[in-house]
Amino acid sequence: MSAPAAARRAGARHAAAAPLAAYVLHHYDWSESSLVLELFTRERGRLAAVAKGAKRPYSQLRGVLLPFQRLQVTLGRAADDAQAEVHLLRGAEWAGGAAMPGGAALLPGFYLNELLLRLLAREDPHPALFDAYAHALTLLAAADEAGWQPVLRAFELRLLRETGVLPELARVTLTQQPLRAGSAYTLQPEAGVCASSSGPGISSSVQSVRA
């Protein structure tokens, strides 16, 4: 093996061993004693990892691998399976921080997790989105039911921007003309921002979305 190739492989092993900031988005059974985790990490995006032995009664991971709990995880791969999409969970510990959503606030929290699972590709880092997700969980934990909707809508917009789905909101999508103060516009799922004949309330809504 050439020296550069050996250096690259050594660097890859070092990167794999570095702790990652992570949240558990979802898990499902892998075997009688193990789980497959869907993780959202700050450094490497969405990943899948096998947590061997996590279902055993005395496993230290049972109280750690919980949704909405910020973790520090260490991942690896088997030596003969370097290209596998599913990683091995080498270790996980609670990272501390803000309170987790509980009770009725679990429902909007799981909604955020579902958005990330459906819209994020694997191994595609979005550190700013990770931070926005952590902030949204903090807000949900502190808010009552009336306060959930602003948190969810703000996160949806951030997610659409990060994934490149949200159109430019300062212009009419079809004509690329700038939005004019006092005019009314609507945001259509397939057409983007469109001029509207409705009242001025829609215009102010678009302005708030742009903000």
Where are these regions (language model features)?
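Non-catalytic alpha-helical scaffolds and adjoining flexible linkers that form interface surfaces
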Residues: 1-35, 40-211
